[in-house]
Protein backbone atom coordinates (compact mmCIF):
# COMPACT_ATOMS: atom_id res chain seq x y z
CA UNK A 1 0.00 0.00 0.00
CA UNK A 2 1.06 3.53 -0.63
CA UNK A 3 -0.50 6.92 -0.08
CA UNK A 4 -1.89 9.17 -2.79
CA UNK A 5 1.02 11.56 -2.20
CA UNK A 6 3.57 8.75 -2.63
CA UNK A 7 1.79 7.63 -5.82
CA UNK A 8 1.93 11.14 -7.27
CA UNK A 9 5.64 11.41 -6.42
CA UNK A 10 6.34 8.12 -8.20
CA UNK A 11 4.44 9.27 -11.30
CA UNK A 12 6.28 12.61 -11.36
CA UNK A 13 9.58 10.73 -11.06
CA UNK A 14 8.65 8.32 -13.88
CA UNK A 15 7.45 11.02 -16.31
CA UNK A 16 11.01 11.92 -17.27
CA UNK A 17 12.49 8.44 -17.02
CA UNK A 18 10.33 6.07 -19.09
CA UNK A 19 11.76 4.88 -22.39
CA UNK A 20 11.75 1.78 -24.57
CA UNK A 21 14.28 0.13 -26.79
CA UNK A 22 13.50 -0.02 -30.51
CA UNK A 23 15.90 -1.08 -33.26
CA UNK A 24 18.85 -0.71 -30.92
CA UNK A 25 17.92 2.83 -29.88
CA UNK A 26 16.47 4.07 -26.61
CA UNK A 27 13.31 6.09 -27.32
CA UNK A 28 12.09 8.39 -24.53
CA UNK A 29 8.36 8.33 -23.81
CA UNK A 30 7.17 11.92 -23.74
CA UNK A 31 5.58 13.13 -20.52
CA UNK A 32 2.45 14.21 -22.43
CA UNK A 33 1.98 10.56 -23.45
CA UNK A 34 1.93 9.26 -19.87
CA UNK A 35 -1.43 9.41 -18.09
CA UNK A 36 -2.07 8.39 -14.48
CA UNK A 37 -5.18 6.20 -14.31
CA UNK A 38 -6.85 3.87 -11.81
CA UNK A 39 -7.09 4.68 -8.12
CA UNK A 40 -4.40 7.34 -8.47
CA UNK A 41 -6.49 9.32 -10.98
CA UNK A 42 -9.55 8.82 -8.76
CA UNK A 43 -7.44 10.31 -5.94
CA UNK A 44 -8.10 7.53 -3.47
CA UNK A 45 -6.23 8.06 -0.20
CA UNK A 46 -4.54 4.64 -0.25
CA UNK A 47 -3.35 2.86 -3.38
CA UNK A 48 -2.57 -0.80 -3.98
CA UNK A 49 -0.49 0.06 -7.04
CA UNK A 50 0.29 2.80 -9.53
CA UNK A 51 -1.44 2.57 -12.92
CA UNK A 52 -0.08 4.42 -15.93
CA UNK A 53 -1.39 4.58 -19.47
CA UNK A 54 1.20 5.14 -22.19
CA UNK A 55 -0.11 6.65 -25.42
CA UNK A 56 1.75 5.16 -28.38
CA UNK A 57 1.90 7.44 -31.44
CA UNK A 58 2.27 4.73 -34.10
CA UNK A 59 0.67 1.29 -34.35
CA UNK A 60 3.96 -0.27 -35.52
CA UNK A 61 5.54 0.70 -32.18
CA UNK A 62 2.78 -0.83 -30.04
CA UNK A 63 4.32 -4.29 -29.79
CA UNK A 64 7.74 -2.84 -28.88
CA UNK A 65 6.95 -0.44 -26.03
CA UNK A 66 6.09 -2.57 -22.99
CA UNK A 67 8.25 -5.64 -23.68
CA UNK A 68 11.24 -3.29 -24.05
CA UNK A 69 10.42 -0.81 -21.28
CA UNK A 70 13.29 0.93 -19.50
CA UNK A 71 13.22 3.17 -16.43
CA UNK A 72 16.28 5.38 -16.08
CA UNK A 73 17.79 5.32 -12.61
CA UNK A 74 15.16 3.08 -11.02
CA UNK A 75 15.45 -0.58 -10.13
CA UNK A 76 12.54 -2.73 -11.29
CA UNK A 77 11.58 -6.31 -12.08
CA UNK A 78 8.97 -7.56 -14.51
CA UNK A 79 6.21 -9.81 -13.18
CA UNK A 80 4.39 -10.24 -16.49
CA UNK A 81 4.50 -8.29 -19.72
CA UNK A 82 2.65 -8.28 -23.01
CA UNK A 83 1.90 -5.84 -25.80
CA UNK A 84 -0.90 -3.99 -23.98
CA UNK A 85 -0.17 -4.52 -20.26
CA UNK A 86 2.93 -4.88 -18.14
CA UNK A 87 3.15 -5.45 -14.39
CA UNK A 88 6.39 -4.33 -12.77
CA UNK A 89 7.72 -4.12 -9.26
CA UNK A 90 9.70 -0.93 -8.70
CA UNK A 91 12.07 -0.02 -5.89
CA UNK A 92 11.12 3.40 -4.53
CA UNK A 93 12.51 4.89 -1.33
CA UNK A 94 13.62 1.47 -0.03
CA UNK A 95 10.20 -0.13 -0.62
CA UNK A 96 8.75 -2.21 -3.44
CA UNK A 97 5.59 -1.11 -5.23
CA UNK A 98 3.58 -2.52 -8.09
CA UNK A 99 3.46 -0.48 -11.28
CA UNK A 100 0.89 -1.45 -13.91
CA UNK A 101 1.56 -0.05 -17.36
CA UNK A 102 -1.01 -0.08 -20.16
CA UNK A 103 -0.71 1.08 -23.76
CA UNK A 104 -3.19 2.66 -26.16
CA UNK A 105 -2.98 4.20 -29.59
CA UNK A 106 -3.69 7.93 -29.89
CA UNK A 107 -7.16 7.31 -31.33
CA UNK A 108 -7.97 5.00 -28.38
CA UNK A 109 -6.86 7.50 -25.73
CA UNK A 110 -10.27 8.75 -24.45
CA UNK A 111 -11.64 5.20 -24.32
CA UNK A 112 -8.53 3.85 -22.58
CA UNK A 113 -8.45 6.66 -20.01
CA UNK A 114 -12.11 6.02 -19.20
CA UNK A 115 -11.62 2.25 -19.02
CA UNK A 116 -8.46 2.25 -16.91
CA UNK A 117 -9.65 5.00 -14.55
CA UNK A 118 -12.78 3.10 -13.53
CA UNK A 119 -13.88 2.20 -10.94
CA UNK A 120 -15.28 -1.13 -12.11
CA UNK A 121 -18.73 -0.52 -10.57
CA UNK A 122 -19.07 2.73 -12.53
CA UNK A 123 -17.93 1.11 -15.78
CA UNK A 124 -20.41 -1.74 -15.34
CA UNK A 125 -23.33 0.69 -15.02
CA UNK A 126 -22.29 2.71 -18.08
CA UNK A 127 -21.71 -0.42 -20.17
CA UNK A 128 -25.01 -1.97 -19.08
CA UNK A 129 -26.89 1.15 -20.22
CA UNK A 130 -25.04 1.09 -23.54
CA UNK A 131 -25.69 -2.63 -24.01
CA UNK A 132 -29.44 -1.94 -23.93
CA UNK A 133 -28.83 0.23 -27.01
CA UNK A 134 -26.75 -2.55 -28.65
CA UNK A 135 -23.43 -0.81 -28.05
CA UNK A 136 -20.24 -2.20 -26.56
CA UNK A 137 -17.66 0.09 -24.96
CA UNK A 138 -14.13 -0.97 -24.09
CA UNK A 139 -10.63 0.50 -23.92
CA UNK A 140 -10.30 0.41 -27.72
CA UNK A 141 -13.49 2.21 -28.72
CA UNK A 142 -17.27 2.16 -29.02
CA UNK A 143 -18.75 -0.64 -31.11
CA UNK A 144 -22.19 -1.41 -32.56
CA UNK A 145 -22.67 -4.91 -33.98
CA UNK A 146 -18.89 -5.47 -33.67
CA UNK A 147 -18.18 -2.45 -35.88
CA UNK A 148 -16.23 0.50 -34.55
CA UNK A 149 -18.41 3.59 -34.24
CA UNK A 150 -16.24 6.57 -35.19
CA UNK A 151 -16.68 9.46 -32.77
CA UNK A 152 -15.02 12.83 -33.25
CA UNK A 153 -13.69 13.07 -29.71
CA UNK A 154 -10.30 13.62 -28.15
CA UNK A 155 -11.05 13.59 -24.41
CA UNK A 156 -12.73 11.35 -21.89
CA UNK A 157 -15.16 14.16 -21.05
CA UNK A 158 -16.22 14.42 -24.72
CA UNK A 159 -16.68 10.63 -24.80
CA UNK A 160 -19.04 10.61 -21.81
CA UNK A 161 -21.10 13.51 -23.18
CA UNK A 162 -21.24 11.90 -26.64
CA UNK A 163 -22.60 8.72 -25.01
CA UNK A 164 -25.36 10.76 -23.37
CA UNK A 165 -24.13 10.58 -19.79
CA UNK A 166 -23.20 13.27 -17.30
CA UNK A 167 -19.46 13.58 -16.87
CA UNK A 168 -18.22 12.96 -13.35
CA UNK A 169 -14.69 13.78 -12.31
CA UNK A 170 -12.82 10.56 -11.47
CA UNK A 171 -12.86 11.01 -7.68
CA UNK A 172 -16.69 11.40 -7.74
CA UNK A 173 -17.30 8.13 -9.61
CA UNK A 174 -18.92 5.38 -7.59
From Swiss-Prot:
Outcome of mutating residue 115 to A: Complete loss of MgdGTP binding and dG:dGTP ternary complex formation but not dG:dCTP ternary complex formation
EC number(s) recorded for this UniProt protein: 2.7.7.7
Biological function: Error-prone polymerase lacking a proofreading 3'-5' exonuclease which catalyzes the gap-filling reaction during the DNA repair process. Specifically binds intermediates in the single-nucleotide base-excision repair process. Also catalyzes DNA polymerization with low nucleotide-insertion fidelity. Probably acts as a strategic DNA mutase, which gives rise to a rapid emergence of variants. Generates mismatched G-G pairs, in that case, the polymerase first binds the deoxynucleotide followed by mismatch formation.
Catalytic reactions on record: DNA(n) + a 2'-deoxyribonucleoside 5'-triphosphate = DNA(n+1) + diphosphate
Name recorded for this polypeptide: Repair DNA polymerase X
Spans annotated as Involved in ssDNA binding: 42-51
Keyword Magnesium: yes
Documented effect of changing residue 115 to E: 36x decreased dG:dGTP misincorporation
GO molecular function: DNA binding; DNA-directed DNA polymerase activity; metal ion binding
Taxonomic placement: Viruses, Varidnaviria, Bamfordvirae, Nucleocytoviricota, Pokkesviricetes
Origin species: African swine fever virus (strain Badajoz 1971 Vero-adapted)
Textual note on the cofactor: In the presence of magnesium, pol X shows a strong preference for the ssDNA gaps having one and two nucleotides.
Keywords carried by this UniProt record: Disulfide bond, DNA damage, DNA repair, DNA-binding, DNA-directed DNA polymerase, Magnesium, Metal-binding, Nucleotidyltransferase, Transferase, Virion
Marked site positions, Stabilizes dGTP in a syn conformation to overcome the Watson-Crick base pairing constraint: 115
Cofactor: Mg(2+)
Binding site for Mg(2+): 49, 51, 100
Disulfide bonds: 81-86
Enzyme class: transferase
Swiss-Prot/TrEMBL GO biological process terms: double-strand break repair via nonhomologous end joining
Subcellular location: Virion
Amino acid sequence: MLTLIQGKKIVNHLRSRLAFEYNGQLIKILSKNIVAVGSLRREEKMLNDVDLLIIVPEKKLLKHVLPNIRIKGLSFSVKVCGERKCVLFIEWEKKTYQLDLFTALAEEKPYAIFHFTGPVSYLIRIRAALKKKNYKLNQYGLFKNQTLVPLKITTEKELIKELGFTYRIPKKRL
